[in-house]
Amino acid sequence: MFDKNCAACHASARIGTVLPLAEVGTDRNRIDSWRGQSAIAANKAVKDMGVERKGLVEADPTGYIAAFLDGIWLKAPYLHNGSVPTLRNLLEPAAQRPKLFYRGYDVYDPANVGFISKRPEAERAGTKYEVERKGNGNQGHELGVAFPAQERDALIEFVKTH
């Protein structure tokens, strides 16, 4: 399941490369908020402080970087902006993903692979996250939505062990 549907981006030569936004389909606001001029200014500030390090890329970003999924079961919430609370939600169409949840409550949900984000204790301990707000969109990366439920369950069980 993983090899057939996920490995092309998350376990291949594409690791560390930029996947075009049009291909991934996720919220573009992070790209729009960090332009090349921002990197130029940040690199100058670091250099002015006397810090020697490799600078930030000074070109305008065009997409998001493909990453390994090792340990993904403990990296919730998901997508680049943390807009999807569980892996099970990520395998649903964006229209069915939660529109509001609470981030910051650190009780793990092993069945759905993420952190509990809807119960009263999550509301008390967490911060409200609304996907309708600019930059918080949970659309895109709808690669698992067509899988039968049994295959989604198998994929979730697989990533729990990697």
Give the positions of each predicted feature.
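Periplasmic c-type cytochrome electron-transfer domains
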Residues: M1-H162
